[in-house]
Amino acid sequence: MSTHFFGLTDRSFAYSHSVGRNEFSGTGFRNPVDMAVGDNDVMYVVNRGYEYRTDGVHITVVTLSEEYITEFGSYGAGPGQFVWPTAIALDGQGNVYLADEWLNRISVFNGEGEFLRSWPDGFEGGATQDDSSRMIAFGAGADIPAGKSGSGDGELDRPAGIAISKDGTIFVTDSRNHRVQKFTLDGKFLGKFGTFGSGLGELNMPWGISLDKEGNVFVADWRNDRIQQFTADGEWMASFGQSGDGVGQFNRPNGVCVDDDGDIYVADWLNNRVQVLAPDGRFVTALKGDHVLSQWGKDKLNSNPDMIRQRALAVSHNPNYERSFNHPCAVKIDGQGRLAVLDHFGGRIQVYAKSKDPVLV
């Protein structure tokens, strides 16, 4: 548990449990990079896999109660496939939007994983490729040409984050164009904001993006090591953080979300922690991981005596071997107000319950 008293309010975060383990398919994740929360606490987890194991590239659908539901998607450039999946979001109907920074496109699926369309390349659901036309690569992008990139309105160059507002506006962090673009649900360009730089309102390879309940936009300004806040129209509002490993400082933040209290959660990638900020950007606390082996992990461990011995040896040398975050990459708030932290190299989700009570100071 991590607790930090701040003003007249305390916020405490009690570790609940973990979901997942390192696995290429089924009840686990392999180099996960983002997740989205659906109804009934269903989680859609984007697996990036390895360059030498492209079967790890897919979306896993689970619940935070450790129920495995299904997985969908595969490696490739065809309709419904992806090479470097990076970010995921759901619209109000439960459709899934996936950003691919290699193919420079957004692919859309229904909640069951059926491909519907993609843009800006214009693939529609039902399109197929015969076996002779399929491109197979064993290194990311080795045999698959990168999707067309551009800097014009509606064109993408390494889309890295995606969020969808209540009115159906899609916000995409267009990383190498150093901007945020806005689209309709079917991919029509609506507007953009942000330019390259380190000044207020400027961006340098923005990554994660999230909206608060008022519709304000929070961007993980990755290379500037800060979080920036904008209105939905792109007007700059605030900037939080700077480079470093101290309180309120960041080292390549790549995920951000905001809860109903307005508290801001930042996946501080290279500092291996999640920082919690008050609505005005002041530091509240930092979470560094409290992992206890998930049920899926226990099931695998109990069936493999050699793995039991190897794990015991690793833990004896470093008691924090398992518990700590290992490059946290995404943070989300579920329907119960719990914080879910996606651990990239840990291949798991760590879940925390928040308490916020008045205290006497």
What name fits each language-model region?
Residues 1-361:
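Eukaryotic scaffold repeat domains enriched in small/polar residues
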